[in-house]
Amino acid sequence: MEQIKSQYIELVRFNLKAGVTTEQFLSAEKNIRGGAIQKQAGYQGRDIYQDVDGSWLIILRWDNKEAAEAWTPIFMTLKEGQAFGSLLDFSSARQEHYTLVNP
C-alpha cells in the first residue's frame, strides 16, 4: 500500500437547523463536491457521516494546513458555500484539525 506523504484533515461536527431535511442537506453537499473545491490547490477529498443521534461529521482531506486555510475564506463567498452554511446550526458546530504523522 502506498504511503501518503502529507495530509491535513479537518473534522467538522454539527447539527442541521430545525426543519432542514436530510435531502436538502445532501443536495447542498453534492453542490459543494461538484463546485470550485474540485480545483482548489491541495484538496484531496471529503467524506460525510451521520450519527444515530442525527448529528453530522464531515472530514475534509488536504495536502497541508495552508491549503485548508486558503479554502475557508473562498468557501464562504461562493453561492454553494452560503447555501450550505444556511442549513447548519452553528451553535452546535465543532472543528478539529490534525496533521498526518507517519512513524
Q: Would you name each region that the model predicts?
A:
Residues S6, L26, K39-Q40:
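Helix-centric, low-specificity signal for extended rod-like, repetitive segments
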